[in-house]
A protein has these predicted regions:
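Metal-dependent phosphoester/phosphodiester hydrolase catalytic core
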Residues: 1-470
């Protein structure tokens, strides 16, 4: 399309045939933002189904389905939403997205790793056009390749999406402006990563359903926010990447260049990136437990505390990218945890638990992505009492990670499957929430069947998930 801007027309109707058009307008798609369209439509009725489409000259988009949230004073009978994360284009087909579209949820929650910046693996079913995305052009091409997938298109057409990000939209295990290659070349690497992150953030904005008003000066995006579904539910969309402190106890990466065998060995061992760290390691413990370390940043923490204090929702749902309850590994004498998740930020994790208790938040459910496995967890406080439920979705398509050998040491884990890709389908009513772990049989087969591995119920007022019999 070149460097010229284009006026893109949009229409909103009450029916998919567009016999009853209720709003129309145009949006200037600008070249410097890849001709992306972020139209915001005012005056729609709450709690309604609508349909929308776009036109540019003789070209017309497919019809998308949208739903508006119920009014703040309404008490809807039910909310149906799907939860997904981690879609690696090379590792598998996106059949899970197609099944998600077939389910016709009210919302899809995308918890990060919508794209992957890097290609890897032996059993790739298709190839990226470039192995590693580094520049703005690279990231734009990556999103374009993803957006051509018909199953992903079907999921976007099916319903609205509520989105956050994790690390692979930018770089594995990055923390704010610190990459997992920090130290591999000194200030030049830091400067290069700042540019890479800015390019990745811009491409993410261009390709995801977020408001233009979320753009911030200095190449940032205010991603976090909340959404009320009437009185039934409040969603808290968290940003666990842009403002976090560096990972604790990272292996030293002080070598002059990463392009050496010693440098590559350190990177493989986790230099600068997430790794298993000892909870009682005297060399690590002071940094790990430093109360100034943050996952969300001070401003986002203040916003979240205020949003929690004002909530009158029946269900309080946290959409965020990294595991919260955590998994103990290592040995009983020398326990370890993964440094990239919330357990690697124990003071920040405790502040969130304290806020839940202080504001008496009703029915908190933490929805997480990242580990390429299903989990249903009790979230326990320091006294061992269950205070929330965490549900972690597996990958849409990526190599799965089985943690079943760790279960005897982690009684808070009520369910785990690390052998399937898929998603979670939830339905919330005032009295209960049901979560179905929907698995696809083989992500490398585009016609693979699906099944429900397990269903769990959370009764309002309880933080004990209960498995339902088939």
């Amino acid at each position: 399309l070149g460097l010229v801007g284009f006026e893109v027309d949009w229409e909103v109707a009450e029916d998919p045939a567009f016999a009853r058009i209720i709003a129309r307008g145009s949006y200037l798609a600008r070249a410097h933002l890849a001709h992306s369209v972020h139209a915001e439509v005012a005056g729609l009725a709450p709690g309604r189904e609508y349909f929308y489409r776009f036109r540019l000259g003789p070209y017309e988009s497919p019809v998308g389905r949208a739903l508006t949230a119920p009014a703040a004073t309404d008490s809807p009978a039910a909310l149906r939403y799907a939860v997904c994360s981690c879609a690696h284009y090379e590792q598998g087909f996106f059949s899970a997205y197609r099944y998600m579209a077939d389910d016709r949820p009210d919302l899809i929650l995308e918890l990060g790793d919508y794209i992957y910046e890097s290609g890897y693996g032996e059993r790739r079913v298709r190839l990226f056009d470039k192995r590693e995305a580094v520049t703005l052009t690279d990231f734009r091409h990556r999103y374009a390749q993803y957006k051509l997938d018909p199953d992903l298109q079907a999921a976007h057409e099916a319903c609205p999406w509520l989105v956050t990000w994790d690390d692979h939209e930018v770089s594995n295990d990055y923390a704010a402006l610190v990459s997992s290659h920090e130290g591999c070349g000194g200030p030049a690497v830091r400067d290069a990563f700042v540019s890479l992150r800015a390019a990745a953030y811009q491409a993410w904005y261009e390709n995801m359903p977020v408001r233009e008003s979320r753009l911030r000066a200095g190449a940032g995006i205010q991603l976090y926010g909340d959404l009320d579904w009437g009185r039934l539910a409040r969603f808290y969309v968290l940003d666990t990447r842009q403002y976090r402190s560096p990972l604790a106890c990272a292996l030293p990466a002080t070598f002059a260049t990463c392009d050496t065998e010693a440098g590559r060995a350190l990177l493989r061992a986790g230099a600068g990136g997430g790794r298993q760290i000892g909870l009682n390691d005297p060399a690590c413990k002071p940094e790990l437990e430093d109360p100034s370390r943050t996952m969300l940043g001070a401003e986002q923490e203040r916003w979240l505390d205020g949003a929690l204090s004002s909530s009158r929702a029946r269900w309080n749902l946290f959409a965020q990218g990294t595991p919260f309850a955590g998994i103990l590994e290592g040995t009983p004498e020398a326990p370890t945890t993964f440094s990239d998740g919330w357990p690697g930020y124990p003071a920040a994790r405790q502040r969130l638990l304290d806020a839940l208790a202080r504001h008496r938040v009703a029915n908190p459910v933490i929805l997480s992505g990242d580990p390429h496995a299903f989990f249903v967890n009790e979230v326990r406080n320091a006294r061992g009492a269950s205070v929330a439920v965490e549900m972690i979705t597996t990958s849409i398509a990526n190599n799965n990670k089985d943690k079943s050998k760790t279960l005897p040491r982690n009684p808070h884990i009520r369910f785990h499957d690390g052998t399937h890709s898929g998603y979670i389908l939830c339905e919330a009513t005032p009295g209960r929430m049901q979560a179905d772990m929907v698995a696809i049989e083989d992500m490398r087969d585009p016609r693979t069947p699906r099944s429900v591995l397990a269903s769990y119920e959370i009764v309002a007022g309880s933080s004990q998930p209960r498995r339902l019999e088939p």
